[in-house]
Amino acid sequence: MGTTSETKPKRYISVGLLAHVDSGKTTLSEGILYLTGQIRKPGRVDHGDAFLDNYALERQRGITIFSKQAVFQLGDSQVTLLDTPGHVDFSAEMERTLQVLDYAVLVVSGADGVQGHTRTLWNLLARYRIPTFIFVNKMDQPGTDKTLILKELKKKLDASCVDMEAPEDIATGDEHALEEYLEAGEVSIDTISQMIADRQIFPCYFGAALKLQGVQELLDGIGKYVGDNVSANYDQADNRLQNNGDAQQFGARVYKISRDPQGNRLTHMKITSGELKVKSLLKGGQVSEPWEEKADQIRIYSGEKFETVQQAKAGMICAVTGLKHTFPGEGLGIEAGKQAVTPMLEPVLNYQVYFPDQVCAST
């Protein structure tokens, strides 16, 4: 999993996978991890051996319940792939992940087309202004038609959904791109990258993840069109990483709290600027109840396993031990004064735990 000095990444990118349930999102993640050399063979949801569905309940039910990550190299970039739940009951878990994404891949079933939750996800991606690639899966099933599906994507999602095999469609999304196409017969990679980053176009790829069809093309597209405008600093007004004068100051956004099998509390965060080092003193809390705690350990997870590092740089997603008072959405460092985006979705299921009188709920 980690990177050697020979493969030191030029940039760190976080890419989220989102989908309506049963669209083949986890199967796509298995294909991506297989083709990038992270796993020896793709697992299957129905076999209960998917790399990222590693909780017993997930394997038992065949669904993703918790967002999890895997790390792989793609060209000169280190990519953190965040697999999110597709089931509507766990949408709040998915939405918390959006605030730390640089790009997203929306998976659509070619057999079912744009479904209700697909539109919800699309609206969320627009709300958080996340550049989005679309992968139309299950194109090997009888009755699927690429032309009809692309037409549906344009009608129900956005007219700027473009087939990346049709350069003329790309050119119509921007006046400068059209000039390039008319003069040179193609649109430059830099122009396409900027159009994707600005959400002017949404690249569409078609395939069948179970058979690894179209997955490499998707990876090639991400590797080619993800620009250098990421992993510099997080601008809450834009909900994305942007360059500014505070790039050397530490900043981070917490998106998840969990515990490892040993009971250690893990604060999952994205480093938005500067860097975080082991034993760094972090501050947070309200003015009336401030806290200061040290980052005991910095972990980079990939599936169930992790490696510890001495520092995490801007753009990296890590889990930190030793922090007892952090909460999802909290900003640390220069992010402390920036309000997190208020979640649009709420958990469908709610539980309340009652402790016996002799038990202190705060400990």
Residue ranges and their predicted role:
Residues 1-363:
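Structural and coupling elements of P-loop NTPases
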